[in-house]
Amino acid sequence: MASSLDLLKLISERGADSRGASDIVEQQAVKQLLEQVDYSKRSKKINIRNKLTPDEENAFRARYGGAFDLNLTQQYNAPHSLAGALRIAEHYDCLSSFPPLDPIIDFGGSWWHHYSRKDTRIHSCCPVLGVRDAARHEERLCRMRKLLQECDDREDLPDFCIDRAESCSVQADWAICIHGGYDMGYTGLCEAMHSHGVRILRGTIMFDGAMLFDNEGVLPLLKCRWMKSGKGKSEVIKFDFMNESTLSYIHSWTNLGSFLTESVHVIGGTTYLLERELLKCNIMTYKIVATNLKCPKETLRHCVWFENISQYVAVNIPEDWNLTHWKPVRVAKTTVREVEEIAFRCFKENKEWTENMKAIASILSAKSSTVIINGQAIMAGERLNIDEYHLVAFALTMNLYQKYENIRNFYSEMEWKGWVNHFKTRFWWGGSTATSSTGKIREFLAGKFPWLRLDSYKDSFVFLSKISDVKEFENDSVPISRLRSFFSSEDLMERIELELESAQKRRREKKKKEVEKIDEEEFQDAIDIPNDAVRDDAKPEKEPKPEVTVGAEPTGPEEASRHFAIKEFSDYCRRLDCNAVSNLRRLWAIAGCDGRTARNKSILETYHRVDDMINLHYPGGQWLYPKKYDYEVGFNDSGLGPKFDDELYVVDKSCICANYQVLSKNTDSLKAPSCKISLCDGVAGCGKTTAIKSASNIAEHLVVTANKKSAEDVREALFPHNPSSEIAFKVIRTADSALMHGLPRCKRLLVDEAGLLHYGQLLAVAALCKCQSVLAFGDTEQISFKSRDATFRLKYGDLQFDSRDIVTETWRCPQDVISAVQTLKRGGNRTSKYLGWKSHSKVSRSISHKEIASPLQVTLSREKFYLTMTQADKAALVSRAKDFPELDKAWIEKHIKTVHEAQGVSVDHAVLVRLKSTKCDLFKTEEYCLVALTRHKITFEYLYVGMLSGDLIFRSIS
């Protein structure tokens, strides 16, 4: 039986589903393609035609990770193939640090490398310092001719010169130096940067930490042997690639060593700072930064990790059988440790010293030789040089005798042996015979009569010294470096002793701080108020608290807490003022302002693109950019303060209301008040403003708010007919205004949105008005006081109270907000008052959400209030509002706020807008999401671009 199939009906019924599946497949394909494109942008493909071994490939990837995509063609054998591959990657690495369209100088590099890649922005300084350089130019010209004959589309010429870098006049802001610093040295590079006007240079050189201690060594990954010869300024270092027939490299050791011994160089008014960034695969990446800012003298510390010598110690042995000349020999730390452990146990005091040395030599030989186990040769330790083996054994033997002698003397010093011995040990030995420190008498005689040989054996020689895991280089910010002591063997023991003394001093200070910290924590436990507050948590009545002055010792934990809170707020305001001055001073300096004009307006243009509050005022009243904001103060050479029309000054957002200096000064000497603090802790919309209206008595009370918007709301509630009257502004003030201009006395102080105030600021206001009690209104679960300086650690910022009343009924929030907030709170604070809150609102459904693609899909209405979590989204909405002619500037300033700015606001219709799907921690923070969800009375709309992981708003309302 045949069955008919209605194809059109099937398509109409299932076409939508099929289309949906097709869209999913396309979306996944596009997503994968975008990921591949993104990876290709982040990585550079490097074609290596040289043959590399698997170990060399691993070394390359260990150096650069996934930053480069290595394409190995394995076409032909080439000398030092890994070094060549790394050199190409080093070019890409250094060039990628600079703007892609700016010109760049290459000191001592190959112009062919850039020309073959059509990188026309790079000028190469390729001086002819010898026949090798001249031959390289001929080879590059040959390659260029070959390329021009094979490619018809090349019409450009290479950009290079044969002048020394310091003699070339080409100007650029950036430069690279790939293995070109060997012949120039650090000072030469700085001079080259100065002649070119270069601000930042990045470069690479081959370096081994052992070069600072040994005369020869091997760079194993690069298969290169190095050797130093000569002395003083004529000392050179030679690089030979092993098992290869190539020209070797000879460079001045003074030039190469300067990259590890100098950090700062000054030419005229320009200071150059060298920073060593990475030392891996025996290639060191460094950068040199030039600055014309005034730099005070300081001591710089720079650490460099020597991974190839960190597991060694230096054993000092006699050189040429001369007791007055010793040299260090590197021996593996494990070898020395095991030899000492075994030899110390087997030491025979009554035997001849030669017998003990034989025992040590036997152990040393066993720990640094080849062992055959089951027919397989296994290397135990590292084999010593045949000329140094017996002297290392002798040095370890003498060191062992010395330790036994010190232990014996130490044991002997525990007994009292009369005044003669006491005199000897204090004035001849210097306090201890065990340590053999030089006493005053012996030191004087040894200096006057050196032939008496009054110094001890230990005073003359050092057998063991740790080479170091990390060397801490110190350098003054002048061209003279203190690191040259690295090359002086006479200073090695002195440096070790200084390091030991410094370490012991740090340990003592650390122990002292730990004891002080314990005492402070015990005192802190006594003054801290528990966070797990319960309902009806009235604290027991206490005796009246005396006032505490700044200079007086607190008489109790609560007085101390209030005293420190006010002091912390004063310090916090002082820090913000210093930050504002520092930022403006930096902007003034880098813009090249001199009192009449700004020489570098491009800097201001760059800053203005990020923050349109940054501007420059010219003498005569002109502004660099159209003035959008009113500024109270400005900054120039005379500092931060009010300015006149005939002055040149810069401004930023801190100049709109610069009151931190006054706040800090006015609160610094205040006494801690002894008044009782009560908190009305209510849910959002519980009627805190109404409660303030009911509780206030104009004759005896004052009202202080956390922000200007709250003050306006309270004035409208208490003085509905004339909120701008003089009496309204006198009794209802912001906390900042109260501290800056003072307050009249009152019996009770009412504080609105107290959680937004620093605890010390609230106490300072109470101290000014001499009130007997404080009634604070707020919500402990909404946004609290936040520091504007992430580096300033707050200890006393949270509000502390003597009693608290909890209100769990709201008159503002609709019914669906109740369940949304309860969903928000689940899994968080189980003692939250919002888990059992109730609403008297008659609105049952108010929440909606909608996904948008861009800010252009946001339609702004005069009847709605717009919220954002970030200032960036707020700026985007403000820009979008300009597309609506009916929305004036006053409306925009009043109806577009961040959630933080909108705390305490109550509106009919609220719209929360998120314009990015990237990470935003504020959408994962309960207190911010709670404020956002509880501002409206009738409707709440959530407009968002893309899904955001961990979005609490979407989870609560969906």
Curated annotation (Swiss-Prot):
Residue span of region Disordered: 529-557
EC number per UniProt: 3.6.4.-, 2.1.1.-
Keyword Metal-binding: no
Residues covered by the Alphavirus-like MT domain: 71-260
Region feature (Methyltransferase): 49-380
Main localization, broad class: host cell
Binding site for ATP: 682-689
UniProt GO BP: methylation; mRNA modification; RNA processing
InterPro entries xref list: (+)RNA_virus_helicase_core_dom (IPR027351), Alphavirus-like_MT_dom (IPR002588), CMV_1a_C (IPR022184), P-loop_NTPase (IPR027417)
Intrachain S-S bonds: none
Domain (+)RNA virus helicase C-terminal: 808-958
GO molecular function terms attached to this record: ATP binding; helicase activity; hydrolase activity, acting on acid anhydrides; mRNA methyltransferase activity; RNA binding
UniProt keyword Flavoprotein, yes or no: no
Membrane topology term: Peripheral membrane protein
Cellular localisation: Host endoplasmic reticulum membrane
Entry superkingdom: Viruses
Complex formation: Interacts with RNA-directed RNA polymerase 2a.
Protein name as it appears in the record: Replication protein 1a
Organism name: Cowpea chlorotic mottle virus (CCMV)
Taxonomy of the source species: Viruses, Riboviria, Orthornavirae, Kitrinoviricota, Alsuviricetes
